[in-house]
Amino acid sequence: MTLWEDSEANRMSVRLLRTIPILRVFNEAKAREFYLDYLGFSVDFEHRFHDRAPLFMGISRDGLKIFLSEHHGDGTPGTHLRIDVRGVSELFAELRAKQYRYMNPGIQEQEWGQRELTVYDPFGNRLIFSEPVA
């Protein structure tokens, strides 16, 4: 078997499963208020190297995972995430009912055939929840 054939066989058994973005956050309380209370994510884990160390936290909702990090060098402020959803109108209604004082998002119908709900976290990261126009 040649090196190429061996690589081809290995590649056939490899499956890329998912990506988990790391978003930079600067204030734990604000991050919790936005991601947990407002967007409805749950905490999967929290890690600190010691009591006063920066937080690294895994959150999820409906199988979508995001890592939030206070560590310098993790993530870049102003990151954009496009999140495919089913039920963007229902998500809009859910968020509107929470009356988060820093956010009043709306749904936009894009010319490329998507309905999008865009929110910005307190750290400048943009999350675009998107579904195809029916």
Over which residues does each language-model region extend?
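N-terminal beta-strand motif that seeds the catalytic metal site of vicinal oxygen chelate
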Residues: 2-32, 79-81, 131-134
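Vicinal oxygen chelate
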Residues: 3, 26-29, 81-126
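Core segments of cupin and vicinal oxygen chelate
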Residues: 13-15, 22-65
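Short beta->alpha transition motifs characteristic of CBS
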Residues: 22-24, 45, 111, 118, ...
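A short linear hydrophobic-aromatic micro-motif
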Residues: 42-45, 68, 103-106
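Short acidic/glycine-enriched loop/turn segments that link adjacent beta-strands
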Residues: 50-55, 75-77, 110-115
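Active-site beta-strand termini and strand-to-loop segments that position acidic
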Residues: 59-62, 119-122, 132
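Conserved beta-strand in the GNAT
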Residues: 67-69, 128
